[in-house]
């Protein structure tokens, strides 16, 4: 299928994954100057936090783009035509349906946990039947995140595989890849738990793989972790009215 995709278009499977959330693109938008593509939600959140720069290459993004990014309709159409392999069960799924598949893929849930990077806190029940995440629990996680933030401004974590502590996200990633790469033990991800949408009952089967897939960047660079999703997007909408189109 990958060969068919390459032969028919100039795209590869990697082009269908958002560089911010590292998931299959949802409502893809494209920057005008550097032509990088992101999920619309990821892009708007990044613009809210990082200002005038592309989240990937730090290229300039116009004021109009920051409020109303251009849909990558060509890419959306390609995603409706071609399939790719689920990263866990290897089932062939149309790219535009991949996120929906993750919600019902038990292997994906076991491997990576909750499939949405910035979930809706009002969802009453997740895809595997876990209890809903309330705004109160999100507030508790924000307090935990702040308490774990060191003098450098970056939160620190304990390795759940050896209990060594005081790791920043990057140091934890390096530590686990160096010392626990082939250690597959069900644990709870300390980074996920510290985030406003984190679920302390969510167990990750392969922690090191989860780190490499989910935590290659600091969420705080793209998301204001003291605001819930609804507040962030309401702010983005309000700011869009101030843009001179």
Curated annotation (Swiss-Prot):
Keyword Ribonucleoprotein annotated: no
Residues annotated as binding Zn(2+): 86, 89, 101, 105
EC number(s) recorded for this UniProt protein: 2.3.2.27
InterPro entries linked to this entry: Di19_Zn-bd, E3_ubiq-protein_ligase_RNF138, ZF_C2HC_RNF, Znf_RING, Znf_RING/FYVE/PHD
UniProt keyword annotation of Metal-binding present: yes
GO process annotations (BP): DNA double-strand break processing involved in repair via single-strand annealing; double-strand break repair via homologous recombination; protein ubiquitination; Wnt signaling pathway
Zinc fingers (C2HC RNF-type) by residue: 86-105
Subunit structure: Interacts with NLK. Interacts with XRCC5/Ku80. Interacts with RBBP8/CtIP.
Protein name from the UniProt record: E3 ubiquitin-protein ligase RNF138
Organism: Bos taurus
Protein's gene: RNF138
């Amino acid at each position: 299928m990958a060969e068919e995709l390459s032969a028919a278009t100039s795209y590869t499977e990697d082009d269908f994954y958002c560089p911010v959330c590292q998931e299959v693109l949802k409502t893809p938008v494209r920057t005008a100057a550097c032509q990088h593509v992101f999920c619309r939600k990821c892009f708007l959140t990044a613009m809210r936090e990082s200002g005038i720069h592309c989240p990937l290459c730090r290229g300039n993004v116009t004021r109009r783009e920051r409020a109303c990014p251009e849909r990558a309709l060509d890419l959306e159409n390609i995603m409706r035509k071609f399939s790719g392999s689920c990263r866990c069960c290897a089932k062939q799924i149309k790219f535009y349906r991949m996120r929906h598949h993750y919600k019902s893929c038990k292997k994906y849930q076991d491997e990576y946990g909750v499939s949405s990077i910035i979930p809706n806190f009002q969802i009453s029940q997740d895809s595997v039947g876990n209890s809903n995440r309330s705004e109160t629990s999100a507030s508790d996680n924000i307090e935990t995140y702040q308490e774990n933030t060191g003098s450098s401004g970056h939160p620190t974590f304990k390795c759940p595989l050896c209990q060594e502590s005081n790791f920043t996200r990057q140091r934890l990633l390096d530590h686990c890849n160096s010392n626990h790469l082939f250690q597959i033990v069900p644990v709870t991800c300390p980074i996920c738990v510290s985030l406003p949408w984190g679920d302390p009952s969510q167990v990750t089967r392969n922690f090191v793989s989860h780190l490499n897939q989910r935590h290659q960047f600091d969420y705080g660079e793209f998301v204001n972790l003291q605001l819930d999703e609804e507040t962030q997007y309401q702010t983005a909408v309000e700011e869009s009215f101030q843009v001179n189109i």
